[in-house]
Amino acid sequence: MKNIPTIVRNLGTINIRNNVGFSSVPDQVRESSMVKGFELNVLVVGRRGLGTSTLINSIFAAPLVDKKRTNNITATRNEIVENDISLEISIVTYHEANISPVLDYINAMNREYFDNEQGLYKAFKDNRVHVCLYLLPSDTLTDQEIKNMYELSQSCNLVPIIPKADMYTPDELADVKENVRQILSENNIFSFVPYLNENDGDLTEEVADIVGCMPFAVIASETMYEHGGEIIRGRKYPWGFINIDQEESNDFKRLQRLLIYTNLDELTMKTNHLFYNNYRKKIFEIENDCGAMKEARYLRLRTETIRILNDKYESRINALRKEEEEMERFYSEKIREMNDKMGEISKQVEKSLHVE
């Protein structure tokens, strides 16, 4: 397996003081997950300078991503604990234009999981990518970036993100969102959309709100401010203050809920049932094709070997025949010479008898 990065930033177990939501997931999520904890593997792709580290560290209320990381694949793996419930969180970042290394990484993690499934030990870490946050630039998307999103959407749950939403007016932001939706539709890019179950009670309204606001436009901040008598995460400007948790101003809270509250289990299940199963199917098809190719090659080699042996056998038979013919000629010649000699002797004897 190639392009598997080493863990460059491991903070171990982090007990967070500001709840992010995974310890109070809905009843629809398996009870066993509440006991054993949760796993989430997040891939973040996009140009450098769009606020990846600030966004991720804000979502999980922990310093998971280092601002000094490289543009190549960088992985962090940690455990964060909220109200005695743990979340095993893996963050992989990548900021180059060519996403071949990312696709190789996704396939390598799928292959690792596949190999572990075939082994004796069934308890192993799930390192497959559960969701990809694709950070969109404020200027025009390039053809390469559109292609990148399409290819990623074929391999994992893609969630396009409009970062730094505070640089737009409400009307501008509405236009940006509509433009992104149009690009996704025109290029057959299927982003992750939560399943809306009308029988989920209050959760139905919450999920409907999340779906209606996609693609998400977010504002992130790791800084806490005292504002209006409260300690709030937000951003200060000359003209005022933005509380990033306020859903009227941006979709940060909706994105956070999607990842670690309302749809955490759906992301992992879709990874397993759709993307990973597609990968397994390809592996089996390749192995079957390889088996057929090996069988065909074996038959060709066997046929060729028999032909060579037959050719050698026929050549040997011909050589023996030739040798036999030569021996036949040799003995025939010797017999002829002997007969001639015997005839000559007989003539001489007969002649001597006449003389006497």
From Swiss-Prot:
Annotated segments matching region G4 motif: 163-166
Domain of life: Eukaryota
Coiled coil (UniProt feature): none
Record function comment: Septins are GTPases involved in cytokinesis. The septins localize to the site of cleavage and act as a structural scaffold that recruits different components involved in diverse processes at specific stages during the cell cycle. Septins are also involved in cell morphogenesis, chitin deposition, cell cycle regulation, cell compartmentalization and spore wall formation.
UniProt protein name: Cell division control protein 10
MF (Gene Ontology): GTP binding
UniProt-listed PANTHER family: SEPTIN
SUPFAM superfamilies on file: P-loop containing nucleoside triphosphate hydrolases
